[in-house]
Amino acid sequence: MGTVPDPLRSAKTSLIAASGKEDDLGEPQAASPRHRPALLCKNANGFSGAPAEPDLSPRAAAEALMQVCEHETTQPDMSSPGVFNEVQKAPATFNSPGNPQLPGSSQPAASAPSSAAGRDLIHTPLTMPANQHTCQSIPGDQPNAITSSMPEDSLMRSQRTSNREQPEKPSCPVGGVLSSSKDQVSCEFPSPETIQGTVQTPVTAARVVSHSSSPVGGPEGERQGAICDSEMRSCKPLTRESGCSENKQPSVTASGPQGTTSVTPQPTPLTSEPSACPPGPEKVPLPAQRQMSRFKEASTMTNQAESEIKEVPSRAWQDAEVQAVASVESRSVSTSPSILTAFLKESRAPEHFEQEQLRVICHSSGSHTLELSDSTLAPQESSQCPGIMPQVHIQAAAAESTAFQRENKLASLPGGVLKTSSINLVSSNAQHTCKEDGRLAGMTPVREESTAKKLAGTNSSSLKATAIDQISISACSQAETSYGLGKFETRPSEFAEKTTNGHKTDPDCKLSDSCGSISKADHSGSLDPTNKGDAREKKPASPQVVKEKESTGTDTSDAKTLLLNPKSQESGGTESAANPTPSPIRKNQESTLEENRQTKTATSLSLPSDPMGDSSPGSGKKTPSRSVKASPRRPSRVSEFLKEQKLNVTAAAAQVGLTPGDKKKQLGADSKLQLKQSKRVRDVVWDEQGMTWEVYGASLDAESLGIAIQNHLQRQIREHEKLIKTQNSQTRRSISSDTSSNKKLRGRQHSVFQSMLQNFRRPNCCVRPAPSSVLD
């Protein structure tokens, strides 16, 4: 057991990667041997990990899977009887527990075919899985239609054809991988289930184990096929739930690894699979649509909870490392108020404008935020730059970051997108759409709109479901969104909405995110060029969406340079405003996001200030925006201090710095007046509270009044300190004199007493002996 998971995992990873490539290449056969171990690994993981099926012993499952994996890896044809024997042993263990799962007739049928086969290998347990496998392979087709008697070659061919067909089906991303390998199918079948996390995984694993066993006799095979059909029917809802009905079908072929004996049953499922595959794709889209409907429902639910979800992504943005990064200028400005004066005029107007944009961005990102800030950022970023994307996604979610890495690769390679989508059930639609987008960047907006609607549902749903399936679903939807470059644009209506909300707003969101969450360099750096390139490439798709993306690309590029031209931002903001999502919702989202950001003191200052700065053409303006926000607070503080009569010299200086340029001219006169007024104020009689109404109500500049008050307070403090010092010195002197006199007196008293004792004459008995006598 200990050794089984590691090789399986390694094989799984390599096989999964290979399977994705093979699926994209349309070479499932070559990939099949690789995928088989991967699927087996998944099965082993599913068995051991699937608590739902206590009947299956994890050890037996792992051992069988290991054996099958070894057999598959060593023998893609699965002809070696030794391997079959090993597999039979493991499946035997599985079958005993797994039999309750399998139809009762499947075991006798399996045993009968094994006896009929009369092969050295004991396939009884394997035949059990073979029946199940045939059931799986025949979602719509009856397994009995294909008999195990079919020659291995024809079966293999049918398997290949079915496998080829399956990879073509985008709805079978997992299935594609599964179908790529004849034997893989059984292994992979559980793998999609394992991905789905349904109990089916162990069941399918047991079935696969039984399926991989000996070929079923023609009539027995038919019986088993019928049983399997019932099983598949029962499993179909699960597969549909998992959204991988096709994947399960390909998984049926997994029996191949068990050997030619199992291959015969495999061809049965496989041959049935080719026939089943054509309906399978139809069925697959149905489950995908169902999933989409589920996701849409989930999305509606998430939309209902948008405010909460938006808050979470906004928090994530605020938590992003980018927030921690503060431009030196902003810090210097915050520390030195004199610098603020130059920026105040420029930055204040941009603040309102940028705040609106940020709100729009926040809103769009918020609406997209339902999917997650990652999803909004992911579509652009994932499509734009895989390297940067993982970082941003890592901030949001590690799983999503991995998915985004894949998506980034996919964004660069439509095949890659298909791979990731193949992994995801939703990705089946994403694959089609991605393929269409990759092949036809300028596909008619209607098509892509329909696909965009599906993908939009899948994206929002998958992104919303990202918490559970972040890697798989988010990879699909985000791969879609990353292809969303084409898809979003080609989907002018919905993805124009989502892209405007999510993608286009993503540029805005990138501004807000760059301001608040994801590293601006990441957004602008990798995402911007990709956005620009993607937008340019996909301009034919839909000029409106392309324009939006271009604006987003320009915005992101501006964010990159931190020189966001107000024009580009305005265009982005206007476009985002033009986005189908209602402005009131955005406003609500913006308000919520802004509130969330503002609630966070330091981060809120930096975050809103960043978006503010972003709208301003210069990166330096970002710092002014922050400083500007800080500056208004300072004046409020100064006013409070003035009211409280507790002005600090720094506060007064800050006020002077905060005063607009017009006041600078007055500063000279003010300083003179301050001197005069301060002199006058000093002469004023101060009441208990520190100042009389004459002084408090006098028409004095804040600076002069503050200075006068400070001078008065300082004088009082000095006087008080002098008094304290004098008192302390007096008390110390008295204490020192007392202590010294006491010590002296005590010493004297002691010495007098001792002298009296010494001088007192004692009787001879009590006379102190001489010291020498003691020594003697």
Swiss-Prot record:
Bias type Polar residues, positions: 129-161, 193-203, 242-274, 566-580, 725-742
PANTHER family: G PROTEIN-REGULATED INDUCER OF NEURITE OUTGROWTH 3, G PROTEIN-REGULATED INDUCER OF NEURITE OUTGROWTH C-TERMINAL DOMAIN-CONTAINING PROTEIN
Underlying gene: GPRIN3
GO cellular component terms attached to this protein's record: plasma membrane; synapse
Residue ranges of the region described as Disordered: 1-37, 68-312, 518-637, 723-748
GO biological process: cell morphogenesis involved in neuron differentiation; excitatory chemical synaptic transmission; locomotory behavior; neuron projection development; neuronal action potential; response to cocaine; vitamin D receptor signaling pathway
Key word Phosphoprotein present: yes
Name used for this protein in its record: G protein-regulated inducer of neurite outgrowth 3
UniProt keyword annotations, A-Z: Phosphoprotein
Bias (Low complexity) ranges: 101-118, 208-217, 604-620
SS bonds (residue pairs): none
Bias kind Basic and acidic residues: ranges: 520-552
Stored InterPro entries: GPRIN2-like/GPRIN3 (IPR026646), GRIN_C (IPR032745)
Modified residues (Phosphoserine): S332, S365
A Pfam family reported for this protein in Swiss-Prot or TrEMBL: GRIN_C
Organism of origin: Homo sapiens
Functional description taken from the UniProt entry: May be involved in neurite outgrowth.
Source organism superkingdom: Eukaryota
